[in-house]
């Protein structure tokens, strides 16, 4: 399942002293942080299974560290996101085979909607990022 999240980073950059590139990175990193934070965890495998690719969907990580806090995963995603340039597509994906069952539910499991919930809040997350950027500038 591919979901597109489009945020007008140029409009955000115009309201800020930051460059478009910086706003692009910060908004994308905040979205990645939010989806990792919203990911349910028991052992941390699902949170640790998030990965990022630029311009083309890639293949899941060969080995995954359990990451109940999500901190290592967010750092790994952020490192890749900072390589992106304006115009790149950033794919944030989860390689755990059971992720879709938790996201959408089954006849035995209620849906958790951790991805869809984050996508639905993307505009609010971008506004919060802008507010944080502006606060740093003052």
PLM regions and their residue ranges:
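Short, Lys/Arg-rich flexible segments
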Residues: 1-138
């Amino acid at each position: 399942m591919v979901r597109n999240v489009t945020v007008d980073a140029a409009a955000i950059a115009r309201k800020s002293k930051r460059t478009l590139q910086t706003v692009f990175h910060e908004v994308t990193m905040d979205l990645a942080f939010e989806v990792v934070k919203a990911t349910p965890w028991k052992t941390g495998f699902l949170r640790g299974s998030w990965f990022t690719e630029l311009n083309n969907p890639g293949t899941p990580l060969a080995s995954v560290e359990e990451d109940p806090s999500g901190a290592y995963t967010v750092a790994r995603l952020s490192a890749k996101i900072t390589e992106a340039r304006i115009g790149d597509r950033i794919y944030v994906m989860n390689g755990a085979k059971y992720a879709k069952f938790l996201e959408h539910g089954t006849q035995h499991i209620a849906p958790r909607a951790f991805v869809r919930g984050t996508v639905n809040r993307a505009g609010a997350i971008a506004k919060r990022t802008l507010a944080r950027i502006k606060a740093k500038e003052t």
